[in-house]
Amino acid sequence: MHQKITSLLAAVLAVLLCSCGGQPSQQPNLPETPEEAPYAFTLDYHRCAPLVERQIGSDLAAAARLVVDAFLAGETSVTLPEGDYSGNPGNDLGYALNSMCPVFGAVTDYDDNHFDKAARTVTWAYTQTPEQIQEALAALEQTTAAYMSVLRQGDGETARALLLYHALTEPAAYDYEMEHGDGDSTEYQFRTSSYAALVLHSGICYSFAQALAFLYTQAGLDCAAVMGDSETAGLHMWLMAAVDGKWYYFD
């Protein structure tokens, strides 16, 4: 009501000034309503979507957070506490990290062979210099903030999902060169990472699926990248996300 009254008074004042031959001054900038304020966002590499945690288990989600901390500290290994690491924990760990800390998969040689179940250790080597890694982390932080800048406090889950989807996919380009590249090469690991999709706007199907998973997770949307056979593209990865109580596929 206060804002409406202020606007009405400003309009009346402008009319009075014009009728007297005066020039109205610029209407004062009114404060943003809470709903119009920028979305409150803090980058957190520990965030793991609830659906992902249910898929891999809470022990492995906790392991992913330990790996993130060790990676950010410049270390090359971590010893995990006792827990449930059944199945293929090396693959599941990498899967979680792609949507939690995209830089990790882009600048290390990690794959499922680097998870030693017997010793409960995870190891990796860096494929870029410390300076390059810090530049990549800074670039991801800046880019993520730019993505989140399209959101407002009043945006519900549907608005957040659609706005972030558009922000990611509008400049996106498919990396056809890497579609059949050497999966063991450093170049392939970097160019098909979720980091490349986020910062360089380039990648293949799972680059963008995991990149969108990262953005949705940071924005408080439950989601998980899923893989299956596509009628037109063969083996494919896309995103499944919960939006306002319903599950949707995003591709």
Residue ranges, per PLM feature:
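Extracytoplasmic/periplasmic C-terminal soluble domains
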Residues: 183-185, 203, 214
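Hydrophobic/aromatic-rich core segments of domains that either
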Residues: 207-251
